[in-house]
Amino acid sequence: MIITTKALTVLPHSGLRTTHRSLLARLRHYFKNMLCPDLHPPATVRGMKLLDRSAFSKTIKVPHLLVPKDKNLNDICRASKKYLLKMERYKPVITEQYKITLHPLAVQKWEDLADLNLEKLDIGSEALVWEEIQLKYENWKYDEIFKAVLPADKEALSSFSKIGHIIHLNLKDHLLPYKELIGQVICDKIADCRTVVNKSLSIDNTYRNFQMELLCGEPDYRVSVKENACLFEFDFSKVYWNPRLSTEHEKIVKMLAKTDTLFDLYAGVGPFTVPAARRGCKVLANDLNPDSYEALVNNCALNKVSKHVTCHNKDAVDFIKHEVKQALLEKCTDESMEGDIHITMNLPAMAVEHLVHFPGLLKDEDVVLRKQPLVHVYCFAKGVEDKKQIARELVEHWLGTDVTDKLKEIAFVRNVAPNKDMMRVSFYLTEDLLLGRTAVKKRQHEEEDLPQLEEAKRPSNKMKDQRKQLAKKAKTVFSVSQVKKGNLKKTKEVSSNLKKIQVNDKREKVDKKFENLHAQIVSKKAAKPAPKPLPAKNKSKPDTKKIEADLNEMQM
């Protein structure tokens, strides 16, 4: 069942203003129809990309209860209410013919109506007949049509947002071939819908708006929306508005007292600012987007709270360094000031990065702060780990200090995507932090820290390449495990290289020995005097022992 994002009583964001009892009844009939194949759209519409309404027509047989005209039809209708066939734009009671159409899954034989005690009214089993009825495109809801048309093996359209007369979709890639049909069906089936758009690109970090594609209806993006008892008017194509955040807006506003002061750093069109001002709070609101600023000023006037709000159109960093700084000096040092100070930072893609400007914001001032501002900063926590811990680490990283003694609350806001949640971290700006007395960790290469902190924990591509190179080198190193496995290919190669080195080393040593021996022989011949002739019988024998010793040494 598709869920829309207009606040309700039982199903959040269901888009239907109804009571608990009637909503449960609608759900009961919805699932009852889903369990009956005869009440499904024709199977032939599967894969349809251009809407053909006539292709949804089908004829089925269903049970009917024929009521005698002398009986009270209204009483019997009330008694048989749970057995009625309820479908979109189909009347189960035909007053002129005194005929009641029953659900084929609930009534298959006369005994199924035993609890109605029809015999006491002189109505017998002959009153139950099976007759054909014609079902058309108009008799199915949009979610039943999508279930019949879209691919059965892939995720169907699960949700959408309703902003005034605009239906805002965020179609996944596999649904894009069906976008025209989806837009037309939604425009046909949802009351007050005049425009259907699809988000075509991601939200721009500068102005928090996105490019959209018109799927069906009028290109009219001026809307009027009610939220938290306030009226907002804006051009949806130029500003950021998310109805899924209405509950979060309400939570923050309920924290505020009449005497409190609110600094809204990314005010948008005023979902925090306007209801806070209606409570009597003093609000300093800022937004960089000129269209958001214009809508903010207009919405303050529209809700008659302009006297409580000061609007600015500038960069959030400049707003912190000037307007917020000056206001903090005035309010935090004023002994007569009542109420608390709150700072909302609802720009989850980059709000945590602006926390770096708060430590030491008042370091050049010789003041004593009597108030500790409470910051509500929003961020995206990505990963499978504890999202609250990830959000806390993000805040501590950009704030440069531990927030254990400053932390008030870490709250889940909404799920954005698989393994990606929007979180709120509420913490106090202490006097030591604002005056620069708290030691702040230095961040190197801050421009490289823009991704989520947990992303930085993962090995970079450069590190992965280094690891691959080290692994390749490690493969050529002799290891004991290779010997155990019998893989001696690399071992043989290394051992043969070592043998060659040892042989070459021995040859060099032997050559040096020969050179030394040759030098000794030459020097002895040069220093020895000419020999005198001796008698033959007294001829001296050569000293062979020394020569043998030298030869043995060379061989060694």
UniProtKB/Swiss-Prot annotation:
Residues 454-465, 540-549 have a biased composition (Basic and acidic residues). It comes from the Eukaryota. One of its GO terms (molecular function) is tRNA (guanine(37)-N1)-methyltransferase activity. It catalyses: guanosine(37) in tRNA + S-adenosyl-L-methionine = N(1)-methylguanosine(37) in tRNA + S-adenosyl-L-homocysteine + H(+). Keywords: Cytoplasm, Methyltransferase, Mitochondrion, Nucleus, S-adenosyl-L-methionine, Transferase, Transit peptide, tRNA processing. It is an enzyme of class 2 (transferase). The keyword Transit peptide applies. PROSITE patterns: SAM_MT_TRM5_TYW2. Residues 1-30 form a transit peptide. InterPro entries: MeTrfase_TRM5/TYW2, SAM-dependent_MTases_sf, TRM5-TYW2-like_MTfase, TRM5/TYW2-like_N, tRNA_Gua_MeTrfase_euk. S-adenosyl-L-methionine binds at residues 249, 287-288, 315-316, 346. Residues 444-465, 524-556 are annotated as: Disordered. GO terms for biological process: mitochondrial tRNA methylation; tRNA N1-guanine methylation. Belongs to the class I-like SAM-binding methyltransferase superfamily. TRM5/TYW2 family. This is tRNA (guanine(37)-N(1))-methyltransferase.
